[in-house]
Design a protein with these regions (language model features):
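Nucleic-acid nuclease catalytic cores
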Residues: 84-127
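Short, solvent-exposed polar/charged micro-motifs at secondary-structure junctions
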Residues: 61-65, 120-122
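N-terminal, polar/charged subdomain of small-to-medium soluble alpha/beta proteins
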Residues: 68-70
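Solvent-exposed, charged helical/coil patches
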Residues: 1-48, 119, 125-127
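Conserved catalytic cores of phosphodiester-cleaving nucleases, focusing on short active-site segments
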Residues: 28, 51, 73-87, 100
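A structural signal for short, well-ordered beta-strand segments
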Residues: 55-57, 73, 121
Length: 127
């Protein structure tokens, strides 16, 4: 984490998590993911973060497009954020974020679950 790039990712990750905590503190658990996403966007804009929602991810096999998916959010074209309002973060959620990271050539992702009494945040790294 001594590299400048690593420090930038850590700083950005802390800002994202701080925004998530604020949204969870104000809304609490129990809403749909879309409500948290909309509130998150407001918080991120306050932090002057560049946020892209529902970015299309092209999945290729042998250089041929086989399908397109949409990820929840990407912040500063760097960190993929997958929002959940689920009982638990499951292995499949990690697999989905890792596949988005791989398809986009990114290294860092977060899964944020708002359904718990205390917000749940998991980091996902793809190298």
């Amino acid at each position: 984490m001594n590299s400048g790039k690593g420090l930038q990712h850590e700083t950005l990750t802390k800002k994202i998590i701080g925004c998530a905590i604020e949204v969870h503190k104000r809304l609490g658990p129990g809403f749909l993911e879309s409500i948290y996403e909309n509130a998150f966007i407001i918080e991120w804009q306050k932090q002057n973060l560049q946020v892209e929602r529902q970015r299309e991810v092209v999945i290729k096999y042998d250089s041929v497009e086989v399908e397109r998916h949409r990820l929840d959010i990407i912040v500063n074209d760097t960190i993929v954020v997958e929002l959940k309002a689920a009982k638990n973060i499951e292995d499949v959620h990690f697999a989905i974020v890792k596949s988005y990271l791989k398809a986009l050539g990114k290294e860092h992702g977060l899964i944020i679950n708002f359904c718990k009494k205390v917000i749940e945040v998991k980091r996902v790294i793809h190298k």
